């Protein structure tokens, strides 16, 4: 809504005309680029040198957000990282009483979030991260699974605690999933041997392959209807 309501003022019309795109396609492009630029801490001046109109629009958005006193999540992290890395006295004072940092879902951390964590950790006594590299599914939005896979290499004196018991699934599902992930990722994953808490009662387990996502979705829908008795 911010971009839509200020489409002309932010000079997005020039970007639209240059791309030969529709209005909402232009908004989608600039919104995605804005988030990626902040998530990866990219310099708007460098973007402008590569793509003048795109960089110009990003700068316009940044200035307008500040003047209108708005902020989004990606910019919030970016501004905090910049403050932490500038060794701001106010930041140091605000964090002086905080000794320990805990990060959950660490496998999904992106570049700016990792720099945020590092900036905070430098002012604290310890950092405790929790995550599962096998559940890293957000690479498409900038998450870097190497953050957790290589954590013990960056922090040589850290201790690693493995939670290998799975309370959610049966042994058949756990072992099959582990074998599949091992085949896909091999040495690119943290070495682990997950075990199920209980074997449970398996009615049916199988591997299915589909040529398209539509074919897969149709099969799942039909299977669900069969299981609940809908013809």
Residue locations for each model-derived region?
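Charged, alpha-helix-enriched surfaces in structured cytosolic catalytic cores
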Residues: 2, 25, 71, 143-146, ...
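Generic hydrophobic alpha-helical segments
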Residues: 3, 61, 80, 84-87, ...
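Phosphate/oxyanion-binding loops and surfaces in catalytic or ligand/nucleic-acid-binding neighborhoods
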Residues: 6-10, 30-40, 127, 154, ...
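Short helix/loop segment immediately N-terminal to the Walker
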Residues: 15-19, 86-97, 190-197, 229-231
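Helicase P-loop NTPase motor core
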Residues: 156-159, 165-231
């Amino acid at each position: 809504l911010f971009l839509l309501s200020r489409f002309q003022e932010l000079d997005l019309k020039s970007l639209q005309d240059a791309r030969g795109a529709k209005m909402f396609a232009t908004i989608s492009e600039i919104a995605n680029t804005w988030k990626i630029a902040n998530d990866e801490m990219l310099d708007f001046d460098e973007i402008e040198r590569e793509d003048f109109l795109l960089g110009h629009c990003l700068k316009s958005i940044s200035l307008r957000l500040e003047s209108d006193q708005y902020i989004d999540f990606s910019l919030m992290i970016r501004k905090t990282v910049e403050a932490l890395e500038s060794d701001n006295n106010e930041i140091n004072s605000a964090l002086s009483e905080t000794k320990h940092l805990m990060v959950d879902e660490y496998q999904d951390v992106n570049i700016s979030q990792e720099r945020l964590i590092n900036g905070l950790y430098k002012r604290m006594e310890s950092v405790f991260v929790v995550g599962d590299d096998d559940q890293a599914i957000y690479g498409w939005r900038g998450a870097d699974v190497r953050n957790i896979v290589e954590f013990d290499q960056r922090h040589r004196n850290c201790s690693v605690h493995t939670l290998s018991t799975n309370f959610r699934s049966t042994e058949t599902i756990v072992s099959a999933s582990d074998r599949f992930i091992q085949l896909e990722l091999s040495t690119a994953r943290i070495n682990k041997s997950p075990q199920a808490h209980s074997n449970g009662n398996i009615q049916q387990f199988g591997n299915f392959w589909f040529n398209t996502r539509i074919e897969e979705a149709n099969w799942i829908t039909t299977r669900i209807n069969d299981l609940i008795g809908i013809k």
